[in-house]
């Protein structure tokens, strides 16, 4: 079966510093994959390269499905309301109008970190991508929002999608079908 996303010899350098050693990985339909490692191990860099937000210094990423990405630091327009952010990103990405969600009508910059994370995740789900790349997706969510996210991710998996999420949380890691571990920019066997 063709993977939904595959990295072949993907690496990333900043000048002379290698932050991600060449690595290979595949995300297949129906998979929930945890990406773990200490702070600074390269998890965010790897997810950014897989999503196409950063170009790899070497290797290539093959995507046979649409990809949604929720970075650890969301790129939101603070002066826009959450609804305006959703509509803007939907237009930029060529998706139909974003679903009407129960969102506050105040500028995003005035919202809590948890509320901004909810918006960040809503942006990742725009267009119903088959692959989701989520960087510490539950870090700022309250327990009720965490439970809703895990329910939604289970539906993505059941529909034949793939999810790769970075986490430091042992309980979340246990939800995964498999775990990828990074240490000092190297994907461990």
Task: Write out the residue ranges for each language-model feature.
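Conserved structural motif at the start of ABC-family nucleotide-binding domains
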Residues: 5, 20-22
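Helix N-cap at the start of a conserved alpha-helix in ABC-type nucleotide-binding domains
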Residues: 143-145
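Hydrophobic anchor residue at the start of the ABC signature
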Residues: 121
